[in-house]
């Protein structure tokens, strides 16, 4: 977990091994300076994971993202956009493939 601003994880969220969560990016404006020495971009972003959600192994959650309650994020998925409540999202980038309540 690499958070510069805000992370909210609801109750009974299951994080599988090797899940990576971040709300910031690295600067990359000068090709003569290594990325690690260019600083971190903080844009007031917030990551939120709703209660009862399950985040699969090796999933990556990046940026200003809200994962709703009782969601399933598939293994190896890269979440870059919001996932509504009760949805299953998979892939890179992750996309919703099912609404559990439907």
Question: Which residues does each PLM region occupy?
Answer:
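C-terminal/domain-terminus segments
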Residues: 61-94
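Flexible, glycine/small-residue-enriched loop-and-beta-strand segment within the central core
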Residues: 1-65, 92, 100-101
């Amino acid at each position: 977990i690499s958070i510069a601003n805000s992370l909210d994880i609801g109750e009974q969220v299951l994080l599988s091994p090797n899940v990576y969560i971040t709300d910031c990016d690295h600067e990359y404006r000068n090709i003569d300076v290594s990325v690690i020495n260019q600083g971190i971009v903080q844009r007031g972003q917030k990551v939120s994971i709703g209660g009862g959600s399950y985040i699969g192994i090796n999933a990556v959650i990046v940026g200003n993202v809200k994962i709703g309650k009782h969601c399933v994020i598939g293994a190896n998925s890269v979440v870059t956009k919001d996932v509504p409540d009760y949805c299953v999202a998979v892939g890179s980038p992750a996309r919703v493939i099912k609404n559990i309540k439907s």
